[in-house]
């Protein structure tokens, strides 16, 4: 057996049905749709439930999207242990080190984990627990 002699298993491949090509084809005239009725005449729109009140209209509208919402990139204290003692941690440094993918509206430092290094952290926002943990480790926080 050679690569050019390979053939699909018998019955595994079937010919495409060509509907509406004359009565003698077996799939002509109504093309397998039966006679008359809603399903024979055309397609119903997306979400149509046969005249019943559709689900998307039964469920009430809720909320809105605030166009002024600010989304901050989040950094936890545990990930700041990656830096050396006395380092000034800035948003640019966080981007270069791969801790933050994109800056969005800025950076927010949260207090999850334990900080063991003395760092100066510059960010747009800090949680209260993050500020106390950074200062307890001998570091400083600066709001940008």
Curated annotation (Swiss-Prot):
<keyword id="KW-0687">Ribonucleoprotein</keyword>
<dbReference type="InterPro" id="IPR005749">
    <property type="entry name" value="Ribosomal_uL15_bac-type"/>
</dbReference>
<dbReference type="Pfam" id="PF00828">
    <property type="entry name" value="Ribosomal_L27A"/>
</dbReference>
<keyword id="KW-0694">RNA-binding</keyword>
<dbReference type="InterPro" id="IPR030878">
    <property type="entry name" value="Ribosomal_uL15"/>
</dbReference>
<dbReference type="GO" id="GO:0022625">
    <property type="term" value="C:cytosolic large ribosomal subunit"/>
</dbReference>
<keyword id="KW-0699">rRNA-binding</keyword>
<dbReference type="GO" id="GO:0003735">
    <property type="term" value="F:structural constituent of ribosome"/>
</dbReference>
<comment type="subunit">
    <text>Part of the 50S ribosomal subunit.</text>
</comment>
<comment type="function">
    <text>Binds to the 23S rRNA.</text>
</comment>
<dbReference type="InterPro" id="IPR001196">
    <property type="entry name" value="Ribosomal_uL15_CS"/>
</dbReference>
<protein>
    <recommendedName>
        <fullName>Large ribosomal subunit protein uL15</fullName>
    </recommendedName>
</protein>
<feature type="compositionally biased region" description="Gly residues">
    <location>
        <begin position="23"/>
        <end position="35"/>
    </location>
</feature>
<comment type="similarity">
    <text>Belongs to the universal ribosomal protein uL15 family.</text>
</comment>
<feature type="region of interest" description="Disordered">
    <location>
        <begin position="1"/>
        <end position="51"/>
    </location>
</feature>
<dbReference type="GO" id="GO:0006412">
    <property type="term" value="P:translation"/>
</dbReference>
<dbReference type="GO" id="GO:0019843">
    <property type="term" value="F:rRNA binding"/>
</dbReference>
<dbReference type="InterPro" id="IPR021131">
    <property type="entry name" value="Ribosomal_uL15/eL18"/>
</dbReference>
<keyword id="KW-0689">Ribosomal protein</keyword>
<dbReference type="InterPro" id="IPR036227">
    <property type="entry name" value="Ribosomal_uL15/eL18_sf"/>
</dbReference>
